[in-house]
């Protein structure tokens, strides 16, 4: 394995920084997701530096963007007869080694950035198991705590 000179190392580090800068411009305000991507890029940079073929196939860019995102409304009727509408999401990140797998989160703080962060990390968690599963995550800003069975159903 050949060692890289300082200029080559700087250029490659700049490449991951360019990927992150482009991602930040595209996904402004998604702080949880961008922080997760930043941490992963920092940790994989030494391996990325040793394998120029990863850049050729744009491996990092393919990993950091979800395959698809579904956004939908969740209308429901509370015990008082009032109609409420929450937002639901399903982020499907990567199915390169198998079908998307990831849980569901229900909490008022749920937003797209949080689910992208969780789906991104789920991809790596699943890859570390011996089961062929990709990564995804779903959820809604619906708060089930304190709701009746009828409201949750």
Question: What spans do the regions from the language model cover?
Answer:
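N-terminal ligand-binding/catalytic initiation module
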Residues: 13-153
């Amino acid at each position: 394995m050949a060692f890289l000179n300082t200029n080559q190392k700087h250029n490659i580090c700049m490449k991951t920084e360019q990927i992150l800068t482009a991602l930040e411009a595209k996904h402004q305000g998604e702080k949880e997701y961008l922080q997760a991507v930043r941490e992963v890029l920092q940790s994989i940079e030494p391996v990325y530096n040793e394998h120029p073929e990863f850049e050729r196939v744009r491996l990092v860019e393919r990993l950091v963007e979800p395959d698809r995102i579904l956004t939908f409304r969740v209308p429901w009727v509370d015990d008082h007869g009032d109609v409420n509408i929450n937002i639901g999401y399903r982020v499907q990140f990567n199915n390169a080694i198998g079908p998307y797998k990831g849980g569901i989160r229900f909490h008022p703080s749920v937003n797209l950035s949080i689910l992208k962060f969780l789906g991104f990390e789920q991809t790596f968690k699943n890859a570390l198991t011996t089961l062929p599963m990709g990564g995804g995550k779903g959820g809604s800003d619906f708060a089930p705590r304190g709701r009746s069975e009828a409201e949750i159903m």
